[in-house]
Amino acid sequence: MARYFRRRKFCRFTTEGVVEIDYKDIATLKNYITESGKIVPSRITGTRAKYQRQLARAIKRARYLSLLPYTDRHQ
């Protein structure tokens, strides 16, 4: 069986020098939620703990203000 090369995880916010994650930046936040609307864990994205907490807080604020949906579809 062949072993696949795993891409190295890195924190995008650290490399870009982001001070604080903004809840109004919907394009960035959408990269960190699944199709069903769940927040993607840091062990998958590689985000540092400090930024993962800010990310979760920003996503929850955006959901509360109806900028992001809580789920994908209500049926």
From Swiss-Prot:
Superkingdom to which the source organism belongs: Bacteria
Keywords, comma-separated and alphabetical: Ribonucleoprotein, Ribosomal protein, RNA-binding, rRNA-binding
Entry's Gene Ontology molecular function annotations: small ribosomal subunit rRNA binding; structural constituent of ribosome
NCBIfam families xrefs: S18
Subunit comment: Part of the 30S ribosomal subunit. Forms a tight heterodimer with protein bS6.
Biological process terms in GO annotation: translation
Protein name, per record: Small ribosomal subunit protein bS18
Function recorded in the entry: Binds as a heterodimer with protein bS6 to the central domain of the 16S rRNA, where it helps stabilize the platform of the 30S subunit.
GO cellular component terms, A-Z: cytosolic small ribosomal subunit
Stored InterPro entries: Ribosomal_bS18, Ribosomal_bS18_CS, Ribosomal_bS18_sf
Family label: Belongs to the bacterial ribosomal protein bS18 family.
Organism, scientific name: Sodalis glossinidius (strain morsitans)
SUPFAM superfamilies reported in the protein's UniProt record: Ribosomal protein S18 (SSF46911)
